[in-house]
Amino acid sequence: MAKKSMIAKAKRKPKFKVRAYTRCRICGRPKSVYRDFGLCRICLRKMANEGLLPGVKKASW
């Protein structure tokens, strides 16, 4: 789990726009966040496997 102070800091509006960054909505992880879902790769995979993300399915070719 991400540090609570960093999550709170990320929620505040930054002084400059370029300082804003994405965090996972579930765990607060700052790296590897998919913009389409707002989730990190770990939470995205977990939710996709459980079938909680509509339209997402396991690849097979």
Curated annotation (Swiss-Prot):
State the UniProt keywords alphabetically: Metal-binding, Ribonucleoprotein, Ribosomal protein, RNA-binding, rRNA-binding, Zinc
GO terms of molecular function: rRNA binding; structural constituent of ribosome; zinc ion binding
A UniProt-annotated Pfam family: Ribosomal_S14
Where along the chain is Zn(2+) bound? 24, 27, 40, 43
- Recite the UniProt cofactor note for this protein: Binds 1 zinc ion per subunit.
What are the GO cellular component annotations? cytoplasm; small ribosomal subunit
What's a GO biological-process term for it?
translation
Kindly list the cofactors needed. Zn(2+)
The record's InterPro entries line, in alphabetical order, gives:
Ribosomal_uS14 (IPR001209), Ribosomal_uS14_bact (IPR023053), Ribosomal_uS14_CS (IPR018271), Ribosomal_uS14_sf (IPR043140)
Q: Tell me the PANTHER family matching this sequence.
A: 30S RIBOSOMAL PROTEIN S14, SMALL RIBOSOMAL SUBUNIT PROTEIN US14M
Give the protein family: Belongs to the universal ribosomal protein uS14 family. Zinc-binding uS14 subfamily.
User: Which NCBIfam families did the record assign?
Assistant: PRK08061.1
Q: Which HAMAP family match?
A: Ribosomal_uS14_2_B
Q: Outline what the protein does.
A: Binds 16S rRNA, required for the assembly of 30S particles and may also be responsible for determining the conformation of the 16S rRNA at the A site.
How this chain assembles, per its entry, is: Part of the 30S ribosomal subunit. Contacts proteins S3 and S10.
Protein's UniProt name: Small ribosomal subunit protein uS14
Q: Which organism is it from?
A: Nitratiruptor sp. (strain SB155-2)
Whichever gene encodes this chain, its name is rpsZ
